[in-house]
C-alpha cells in the first residue's frame, strides 16, 4: 500500500449520502474542520475521508485537492461532493467553475428580509485581522470579488425566520456576510453577529441541505437532500417555526 499524504482517522465520522465509484456525497457535522491546517493536523474531515477512501484520494493528489471540490465553514453542517477519480474531479471542477452545481442552505435568521425572494449582489473582500491570528474574515467591499446569493423566505414569525439560500458564487463566508449585510444575521454566528444573536443558537444556524450536479461520468442528474439537523430543531421550536423537511418523514 502506498504511503498516504494525509493521516487517516477513523474516529472522524461523517454520513455518506451518495456513493459511486467516481464520486461521493457526504454530510459534514458542525464543528468539524474540512481540511488539515495549523492546530488541526489529524482531526479534520479530510482525515476521515482518507480512512474510507485513502487510496483513491491519494491517487488524486494535492494538485486535485485530494478530491475536495468545495468546503464548508467549520461551524456549518451539510452536504459536500467528493471526487474519487481524476476524470470525475476534472469534470466536476468545470461544473463548479461554470456555476452548474446547485447548492442550497437552510439558515435561521434574526428577522425577515424586506422581500420574500431576491438576490443579494454585493462584492466580498477577505482580510486577516491581527486579533484573529491567521483566521480570515470577509466583508462587503466595493474592491472585493463579485458575490451573489439567491434566497427565499420559507417561514417567518415575530421572533425569527427560516430562509433557503442558494449561493451563486463561492466566496469566503458568503451566505453569512450577505445576510448580515441586509439586516438578517444568522443566529449562532459568533464571528459576524453581536453577542445576543450569536447566543441565540447552539452553533451557527446554517446547514447545506441540498446538492445537485451532473454525474461526471454517467451524465445523469444527481440531486441529494439531507434532513434538518437535530441540534438546530430546538431553535425552530423556540421561534415558532416549522421544520422545512417535516413532510418527508
Regions found by a protein language model. Give the residues of each.
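RNA pseudouridine synthases
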Residues: 1-249
